[in-house]
Curated annotation (Swiss-Prot):
GO cellular component, as recorded: cytoplasm
Protein name: UPF0298 protein SSA_1730
Cellular location(s): Cytoplasm
Keywords, sorted A to Z: Cytoplasm
Family annotation (InterPro entries): DUF2129 (IPR016979)
Pfam families per record: DUF2129
Family: Belongs to the UPF0298 family.
Principal location listed in the UniProt entry: cytoplasm
Length: 89
């Protein structure tokens, strides 16, 4: 049976939108905002730390951040009445 690899999202800010194609070699591009010049890149869990250190050294990358999508609560039933304790800004 195929084992599922853990994946993590990286938010990569670019200087120019034309350089987004160069990042396709590092992982899967899920979303590209042309207005705000960033993209959401999915990579393997074991490669994420290495890429977070090495991608800002590229000339076309402005900043790299880890996505916090896995930390969000995805149980939406009754979420309007729940306390505001796990809010990520």
């Amino acid at each position: 049976m195929i084992e599922r690899e853990e994946r993590v999202g990286l938010i990569v800010y670019l200087y120019y939108n034309r350089d987004a194609k160069k990042l396709a070699n590092f992982g899967d591009i899920i979303y590209h905002s042309k207005k705000h010049r960033y993209l959401h890149l999915y990579v393997n869990q074991e490669d994420a730390q290495n890429l977070q250190e090495n991608l800002p050294k590229e000339r076309y990358v402005k900043q790299v951040r880890i996505s916090h999508i896995k930390e969000l609560d995805q149980n939406f039933v009754g979420s309007l009445y729940r306390e505001q304790e796990n809010v990520i800004i």
